[in-house]
UniProtKB/Swiss-Prot annotation:
Keyword Heme: no
UniProt xrefs under InterPro entries: SpoVG, SpoVG_sf
Family: Belongs to the SpoVG family.
Matching HAMAP family: SpoVG
One GO process term, biological-process aspect: sporulation resulting in formation of a cellular spore
Role of this protein: Could be involved in septation.
Listed Gene3D superfamilies: Stage V sporulation protein G
Key words of the record: Cell cycle, Cell division, Septation
Keyword Cell division appears in the UniProt entry: yes
Gene: spoVG
Superkingdom of origin organism: Bacteria
Species of the source: Onion yellows phytoplasma (strain OY-M)
Protein name: Putative septation protein SpoVG
Pfam family, one: SpoVG
């Protein structure tokens, strides 16, 4: 399975949540809301989940084997690190109105 796109929305704040990611496979299937979390031993990836009526969390989508999990984690962590190392330039839309 080939990863064809990874998008990350960086989140600034006091919580351990550092960002939210979407990953696309072979331009045909996307998994949204993958959380990027700062843990005690560094960044880790949490697959999208929902809270059950019993208060437990259950993954909505997740990899079946360790190779696929590693592929997803590596792609997201690499893209996240690239975002930290090369933040997007903010465009200045203000107009200088000197007459």
């Amino acid at each position: 399975m080939k990863v064809t796109d990874v998008k990350i929305r960086k989140i600034n704040g006091e919580s351990r949540l550092r960002g939210v990611s979407s990953i696309t496979f072979e331009n045909q299937f996307v998994v949204n809301d993958i959380r990027i979390i700062e843990g005690e031993r560094g960044i880790f990836i949490a697959m999208p989940s929902r809270k059950t009526s019993k208060g437990n969390f259950r993954d909505i989508a997740h990899p079946i084997n360790s190779e696929t999990r590693q592929l997803i984690e590596n792609c997201i962590k690499t893209k996240y690190q690239d975002l930290l190392d090369n933040p997007p330039q903010e465009e200045d839309f203000s107009q200088n109105s000197e007459n």
